[in-house]
A protein has these predicted regions:
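FIC/Doc superfamily catalytic core
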Residues: 1-124
Length: 124
């Protein structure tokens, strides 16, 4: 599987944020810590495929709030880029996936549920 680096995530964030929004990282948050959670899950066999990996990027970035602005958009975009890097092309309703990312940020949807939804969408 292909992974996103911290530089990749920052670059994706810079592409999705509007110029009138507050740029940069949130001072008390760590992108490295969010990415370490993903590496940890991989080490312990909790990420079995690209869908699990993409869902972890989306959920952990949405909850982590590592940027001053555009965390949910960055989370979605990282999920989408992760899928694409790993040769998974999904067509989904942006309102539906947007709602799921918002719910992930609120702690209502977790990476397991999002991964299951991604697998379901792959079968459509």
């Amino acid at each position: 599987m292909k992974f996103l680096t911290a530089s990749d995530v920052v670059e994706i964030h810079d592409l999705v944020i509007s110029e009138n929004e507050l740029q940069g990282m949130a001072g008390d948050k760590s992108l490295d810590a969010v990415l370490a959670r993903i590496e940890n899950r991989m080490s312990f066999g909790m990420i079995n495929d690209t869908y699990d990996l993409a869902a972890c990027y989306a959920c952990f970035l949405a909850v982590g709030h590592v940027f001053n602005e555009a965390n949910k958009r960055t989370a979605f975009a990282c999920m989408d880029v992760c899928l694409s890097l790993n040769d998974v092309a999904l067509v989904y309703d942006h309102d539906e996936v947007g709602s799921l990312v918002i719910k992930a940020a609120q702690g209502i949807v977790d990476e397991i549920e999002l991964s299951a939804w991604l697998r379901y969408m792959a079968q459509q």
